[in-house]
Swiss-Prot record:
Pfam families named among the record's database cross-references: DHHC
InterPro entries linked: Palmitoyltrfase_DHHC, PFA4/ZDH16/20/ERF2-like
Record topology, Lumenal segments: 31-43, 162-178
GO molecular function, one term: palmitoyltransferase activity
Family: Belongs to the DHHC palmitoyltransferase family.
Entry's Gene Ontology cellular component terms: dendritic spine; endoplasmic reticulum; endoplasmic reticulum membrane; Golgi apparatus; Golgi membrane
Primary location group: Golgi
Name of the protein in its database record: Palmitoyltransferase ZDHHC12
Example GO biological process: positive regulation of synaptic transmission, GABAergic
Reaction catalysed by this enzyme: L-cysteinyl-[protein] + hexadecanoyl-CoA = S-hexadecanoyl-L-cysteinyl-[protein] + CoA
Domain comment, as recorded: The DHHC domain is required for palmitoyltransferase activity.
EC annotation from Swiss-Prot or TrEMBL: 2.3.1.225
Function, in words: Palmitoyltransferase that catalyzes the addition of palmitate onto various protein substrates. Has a palmitoyltransferase activity toward gephyrin/GPHN, regulating its clustering at synapses and its function in gamma-aminobutyric acid receptor clustering. Thereby, indirectly regulates GABAergic synaptic transmission. Negatively regulates NLRP3-driven inflammation. Catalyzes NLRP3 palmitoylation, leading to its degradation via the chaperone-mediated autophagy (CMA) process.
């Protein structure tokens, strides 16, 4: 019963996004844009490419919004015996805590999401446009979605501009171009928002931090007493780990390495 309102709102948001996506695409095909001109001239390569990009962005959106973002399970999973060097590297008092809402033991960088009512590993933020959290499992796909969506929006913006006719009487212009101009304004707004989101997330990924950690570092137990980010290993390694999973390893290990380096510098 408690999950039904969440699922219902998620279905509404995803349906709205899908309808808006194909509605804008239809407007670009129905008006006298370059997209329609290519189609009428039999040059189908670019229209088909545009449609495939739109479809790809929509599939990525649905994948990110529907997949498990990295929920923390209450039952601990069986793990292999840790190697001796890893055991020596991890300190005895890593600042883990039990969630006061769902009562699971939170791994490092996890946070409870009140909208999803679950704890999420490497929590970044809860995205209302997707009605899902962005966390450890779906964050790379989220960034890929933003990149592809920006390409589609910029191309759509160009196509909408190509169909605008400005030298017409006001009444005739409103009837013939009003809907296309509204589409142009929507695409401009969405392109600006997605550009800012993509730039900010690439910046955070290059520093191996999350939106939540960046905003609330002064309130997070494992960050507030640090002068630097303990998970930062340089932009190249951070990006490689984020998109390719290399080098792999638990966040506790990175935190412990930084702790060990800090202790040695103090000594």
């Amino acid at each position: 019963m408690a999950l039904w309102p969440l699922l219902n709102s998620g279905m509404l948001v995803r349906t709205g996004h899908t309808v808006l996506t194909w509605g804008i695409t239809l407007v670009l095909f129905l008006h006298d844009t370059e997209l329609r001109q290519w189609e009428e001239q039999g040059e189908l390569f670019l229209p088909l490419t545009f449609l495939l990009l739109v479809l790809g962005s929509l599939l990525l959106y649905l994948a990110v919004s529907l997949m498990d973002p990295g929920y923390v399970t209450a039952q601990p999973q069986p793990q292999e015996e840790p190697k001796e060097e890893q055991t020596a590297m991890v300190p005895q008092a890593i600042p883990l805590r039990r969630c006061r809402y769902c009562l699971v033991l939170q791994p490092l960088r996890a946070r409870h999401c009140r909208e999803c009512r679950r704890c999420v590993r490497r929590y970044d933020h809860h995205c209302p446009w997707m009605e899902n959290c962005v966390g450890e499992r779906n964050h790379p796909l989220f960034v890929a979605y933003l990149a592809l969506q920006l390409v589609v929006l910029l191309w759509g913006l160009y196509l909408a501009w190509s169909g605008l006719q400005f030298f017409q009487p006001w009444g005739l212009w409103l009837r013939s171009t009003g809907l296309l101009f509204t589409t142009f304004l929507l695409l401009s707004f969405f392109a600006l928002v997605v550009s800012l989101l993509l730039a900010s997330h690439l910046y955070l990924v290059a520093r191996n931090t999350t939106t939540w950690e960046f905003i609330s570092s002064h309130r997070i137990a494992y960050l507030r007493q640090r002068t630097s980010n303990p998970f930062d290993r340089g932009p190249t390694r951070n990006l490689a780990h984020f998109f390719c999973g290399w080098p792999s390893g638990p966040w506790e290990t990175l935190w412990a390495e930084e702790e060990e380096e800090g202790s040695s510098q103090v000594v």
